Amino acid sequence: MDLVTVEEPLEIWVAYEDKQGELTETSLSITMRTPGEDEALVTGFLFSEGIIRSLEDVTNISTFGPVTEPYSLQNQIKITLKSGERVAEKKFQRHFYSNSSCGVCGKASMAALEMLHLPAIDKTGFRIHDKTLRKLPSRLQESQAEFEKTGGLHGISLVSEDGEILLTKEDVGRHNAMDKLIGQLVLEQTLSANNEGVMKDKMVLVSGRASFELVQKSLVADIPFFSSIGAPSSAAIDLADKYGSTLVGFLKEKDYNIYHGAHRIFW
């Protein structure tokens, strides 16, 4: 029997205090995702958007809406920000429909992405050996349990300097997998914008290509090294260059391309 990846819409709502101190609920985004770990997905999404800075900004996360068949899912989720956390409403101007291949499609402007708080990337913290780097594609694939079943999911791993896969998330969309990874780190209180440097000795490895948005998300999470099995975009290369991160593409056992930040690799 052929197993198929499930893809369902998820509508993300945010409840927050407006400028008048009134509780406001707004629909922020609809994304096509692989169900499961929706709390991590929405937490990582809001962290990457600069709407929350840590788990302390959140009081509740809950799913709601009609139960849909045949998978018995609720496809709406609401994250409530803590009382007194008055969010600048301009942060909600970046409303968009997010499909499984392009999370950034429909953004108000590319410039809005660069307005996000991006920490200063550590210039010396992370270094990985060439031989270790070459082993990572096979380790990523081994860590993708759901991909083994369906062949239809992207994977993103958090990796240590010695090549250990610390965490892997999967989703039909690369940007969702990244949000799930970042979101779990926030939910575990490992990651917050108030704790810069905690990710300085980590890297991310993506099963597909390196897009502007994925590199941006890694920068918001203060991760200095981004590698991908596929090709990077020109905007991703420019972003890595601007903020000083390492960007590797076409990573395979036999070779790879370094687009920026070669000083974090040694032979």
Task: Indicate residue ranges for each PLM-predicted region.
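Short beta-strand-to-turn element immediately C-terminal to the catalytic PLP-Schiff-base lysine
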Residues: V159-S160, Y259-G261
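Short, Lys/Arg-enriched charge-dense amphipathic segments
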Residues: Q76-A88, T168-A177, V220-I229
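Surface-exposed beta-strand edges and their flanking turn/coil or helix-capping segments
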Residues: L41-L46, E56, F92-R94, P119-A120, ...
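Intrinsically disordered, low-complexity regions enriched in acidic/Ser/Thr/Pro/Gln residues
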Residues: M1-I156, S160-E161, I165-L167
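A mid-sequence, solvent-exposed acidic-amphipathic segment
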Residues: P137-L205
